[in-house]
């Protein structure tokens, strides 16, 4: 325990905050180019083929990003926008692709939660406006 005079001289150091998405370097999103698009299997209790992409960002860092939603059009050299947010059952995947921006199209036939997947509003008749 420090003495009072030691605290006057140096003060207490505040604990350093460790960011969950260091490659963004404080930005909300960042642009990058897909270097590889592939599928990955999740951790133990789950079973699937999750769609992921290796992306080289504009700051030179290369990260693994998750492609959310059903179906995508991404391939090598596609330009994507990424945001933070990890995927719990994919180790090392700490970023998400933002759907509906740059080369990534929105999810087709999406009715609910459309803003998360870059889907436009359906042009249906009376049923589209009412619940």
Swiss-Prot record:
Residues bearing 3-methylthioaspartic acid are: 89
List the Pfam families hit by this protein, alphabetically.
Answer: Ribosom_S12_S23 (PF00164)
Any one Gene Ontology cellular component term annotated for this protein: small ribosomal subunit
The family database entries (CDD domains) matched by this protein are listed as: Ribosomal_S12
Annotated GO molecular function terms are:
rRNA binding; structural constituent of ribosome; tRNA binding
GO BP terms, alphabetized: translation
Q: Where is the composition biased (Basic residues)?
A: 111-131
Region Disordered, annotated ranges: 1-32, 110-131
Keyword set for this entry? Methylation, Ribonucleoprotein, Ribosomal protein, RNA-binding, rRNA-binding, tRNA-binding
What top-level branch of life does the organism fall under? Bacteria
Matching InterPro entries = NA-bd_OB-fold, Ribosomal_uS12, Ribosomal_uS12_bac
The function of this protein is:
With S4 and S5 plays an important role in translational accuracy. Interacts with and stabilizes bases of the 16S rRNA that are involved in tRNA selection in the A site and with the mRNA backbone. Located at the interface of the 30S and 50S subunits, it traverses the body of the 30S subunit contacting proteins on the other side and probably holding the rRNA structure together. The combined cluster of proteins S8, S12 and S17 appears to hold together the shoulder and platform of the 30S subunit.
Concerning its family, UniProt says: Belongs to the universal ribosomal protein uS12 family.
**Subunit details:** Part of the 30S ribosomal subunit. Contacts proteins S8 and S17. May interact with IF1 in the 30S initiation complex.
Q: What is this protein called?
A: Small ribosomal subunit protein uS12
Q: Which organism is it from?
A: Acidobacterium capsulatum (strain ATCC 51196 / DSM 11244 / BCRC 80197 / JCM 7670 / NBRC 15755 / NCIMB 13165 / 161)
């Amino acid at each position: 325990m420090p003495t009072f005079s030691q605290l006057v001289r140096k003060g207490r150091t505040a604990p350093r905050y460790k960011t969950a998405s260091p490659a963004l370097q404080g930005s909300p999103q960042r642009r990058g180019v897909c270097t590889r698009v592939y599928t990955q299997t999740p951790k133990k209790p789950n079973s699937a083929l999750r769609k992921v992409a290796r992306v080289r960002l504009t700051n030179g860092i290369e990260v693994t990003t998750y492609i959310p939603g059903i179906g995508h059009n991404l391939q090598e050299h596609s330009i994507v926008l990424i945001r933070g947010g990890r995927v719990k059952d994919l180790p090392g995947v700490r970023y998400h692709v933002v759907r509906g921006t740059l080369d990534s199209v929105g999810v087709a036939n999406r009715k609910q939660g459309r803003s998360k997947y870059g889907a436009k509003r359906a042009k249906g008749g009376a049923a589209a406006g009412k619940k």
